[in-house]
């Protein structure tokens, strides 16, 4: 039987639902809304396997902050009411047949990337449910990303329209242009348009740096900030080598075994 693994970026979904609630202390409303959302996702995707990946709730910013100390340094903590309600949310999702993968220091995106890659490389179908465009660097013929809230696929045509690049160039793009929301600086003075110009001419940061054809207007910037660009690319990239501690059989979706109705 063909495999279709659905991976839910849990906090990406939960935080958006929570922020839309009139009373953000009402965790039951979050549970009700997210379970309805999950039921719709199950109906639309028809997974054979499914898991929800949760980020750790601590302020530890992980290995990325060791490389770039300013990485997400102003990240707001999870609202207290939501943090206290996480166990209840996970329990409600469990009753729908969805197990949770809880990170222990690793960022959820690396756990998602590792699991998605492990399955996709065997030519099995993987769908990531998230609005996070960072996952687009993982795109492959059998790996896709669904933005549930905008009802769109974050696929190769989306990447071409949004960035003008191939998915495999996105980490280099962010290494050059940076990601302001995460305090990934990139090369000062190289914004999205310049990064696109460079990566249209050269496939990678290294290729651009090593070429005598790099436009003069960028040469000084590269000479002064090349190492920063490499570090920023590393931080913007996704790890796919995290030890997960379970196998695919453990997250097989069995419809109705833990039925939870709303």
From Swiss-Prot:
Keywords on record: DNA-binding, Endonuclease, Hydrolase, Magnesium, Metal-binding, Nuclease, Potassium
GO biological process: DNA replication, Okazaki fragment processing
Molecular-function annotations in GO: 5'-3' exonuclease activity; 5'-flap endonuclease activity; DNA binding; magnesium ion binding; potassium ion binding
Cofactor binding, note field: Binds 2 Mg(2+) per subunit. Only one magnesium ion has a direct interaction with the protein, the other interactions are indirect.
Signal peptide segment: none
Record-annotated 5'-3' exonuclease domain positions: 165-255
Region Interaction with DNA: start-end pairs: 189-194
Binding-site positions, Mg(2+): 109
EC number: 3.1.-.-
Residues where K(+) binds: 176-177, 187, 190
Highest rank taxon of the organism: Bacteria
Cofactor(s) listed: Mg(2+); K(+)
Parts forming coiled coils: none
Functional summary from the UniProt entry: Has flap endonuclease activity. During DNA replication, flap endonucleases cleave the 5'-overhanging flap structure that is generated by displacement synthesis when DNA polymerase encounters the 5'-end of a downstream Okazaki fragment.
Stored HAMAP family: Xni
Family recorded in the similarity comment: Belongs to the Xni family.
Protein name according to UniProt: Flap endonuclease Xni
Gene from which the chain derives: xni
């Amino acid at each position: 039987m063909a495999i279709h693994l659905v991976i839910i970026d849990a906090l990406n979904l939960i935080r958006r639902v929570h922020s839309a609630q009139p009373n953000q202390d009402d965790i039951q409303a979050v549970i009700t809304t997210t379970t309805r959302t999950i039921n719709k996702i199950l109906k639309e995707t028809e997974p054979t396997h499914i898991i929800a990946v949760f980020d750790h709730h601590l302020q530890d910013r992980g290995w990325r902050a060791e490389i770039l100390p300013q990485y997400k340094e102003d990240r707001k903590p999870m609202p207290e009411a939501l943090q206290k309600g996480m166990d209840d949310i996970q329990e409600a999702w469990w009753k729908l047949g969805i197990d949770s993968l809880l990170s222990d220091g690793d960022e959820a995106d690396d756990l998602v990337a590792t699991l998605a890659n492990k399955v996709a490389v065997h030519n099995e179908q993987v769908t990531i449910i998230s609005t996070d465009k960072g996952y687009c660097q993982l795109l492959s013929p059998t790996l896709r990303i669904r933005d549930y809230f905008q009802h769109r696929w974050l696929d190769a045509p989306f990447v071409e329209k949004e960035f003008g690049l191939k998915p495999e160039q996105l980490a280099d793009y962010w290494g050059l242009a940076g990601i302001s929301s995460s305090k990934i600086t990139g090369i000062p003075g190289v914004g999205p348009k310049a990064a696109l110009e460079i990566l249209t001419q050269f496939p990678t940061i290294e290729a651009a740096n090593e070429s005598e054809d790099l436009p003069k207007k960028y040469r000084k910037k590269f000479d002064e900030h090349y190492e920063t660009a490499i570090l920023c690319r590393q931080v913007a990239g996704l790890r796919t080598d995290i030890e997960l501690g379970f196998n695919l059989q453990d997250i097989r979706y069995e419809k109705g075994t833990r039925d939870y109705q709303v």
